[in-house]
């Protein structure tokens, strides 16, 4: 009986508390303010960042890389110049295999070597986040500036990709393990982001300073018996393209 009485007392106390009416405010004691915000499109050009320290800006000399000069919501921001150097021609039945030197960037004013890399940015938002695909093509064969001789069947291969970003979804972005560029100008896939992914800035570096493979990850191959001019610099065009994911 005591237990029933105690339970009843608790119930009555709860009901009593629930019946307390809020205190009415006097005139002038309350005022509702507003908060507003407007988001604008970022129309700045994204500058190169350190592929091994995302978000850290670096300075790259023109001889080391090509930097974007036009703004767009979906952009290729930077690509390394592939420097295969001066090579001595020797008679051989084997193809010539030449590795590209690393890219030198200035980080905090200090020359620092990084693997050759490409940087892209997607600033699209909302329904416009359609995903993207990055590709590359040798759109001009290696050609001598003086004689206009072409290396007809040379290839460039990329290996050991390291994809990096400050974005949390960087693990969802795919970078192809190997990329092979043929002299016929055909396009090769490099990386891609699914719809709803890939917002922000991403780098793909080929070889890293910690893995000691920066000077082994981008390779030019020239078929044996290819006629070549000595004391001539050959230059090729590598076009990197970012587009909506199909």
Q: Where do the PLM segments sit?
A:
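Signature of Gram-negative chaperone-usher
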Residues: 2-4, 10, 19-246
């Amino acid at each position: 009986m005591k237990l029933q009485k105690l339970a009843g007392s608790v119930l009555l106390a709860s009901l009593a508390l629930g019946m307390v009416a809020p205190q009415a405010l006097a005139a002038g004691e309350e005022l509702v303010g507003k908060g507003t915000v407007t988001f604008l499109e970022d129309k700045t050009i994204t500058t190169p960042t350190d592929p091994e320290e995302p978000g850290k800006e670096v300075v790259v000399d023109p001889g080391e890389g090509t930097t974007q000069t036009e703004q767009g919501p979906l952009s290729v921001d930077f690509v390394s110049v592939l420097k295969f150097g001066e090579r001595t021609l020797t008679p051989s039945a084997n193809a010539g295999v030449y590795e590209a030197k690393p890219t030198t960037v200035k980080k905090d004013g200090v020359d620092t070597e990084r693997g050759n890399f490409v940087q892209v940015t997607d600033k699209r938002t909302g329904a416009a986040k359609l995903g993207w695909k990055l590709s590359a093509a040798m759109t001009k064969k290696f050609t001598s500036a003086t004689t206009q001789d072409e290396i007809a069947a040379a290839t460039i291969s990329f290996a050991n990709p390291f994809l990096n970003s400050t974005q949390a979804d960087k693990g969802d972005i795919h970078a192809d393990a190997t990329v092979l560029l043929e002299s016929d100008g055909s396009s090769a896939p490099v990386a891609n982001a699914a719809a709803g992914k890939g917002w922000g800035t991403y780098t793909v570096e080929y070889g890293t300073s910690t893995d000691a493979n920066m000077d082994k990850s981008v390779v030019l191959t020239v078929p044996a018996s290819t006629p070549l001019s000595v004391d001539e610099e050959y230059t090729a065009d590598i076009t990197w393209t970012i587009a909506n994911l199909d």
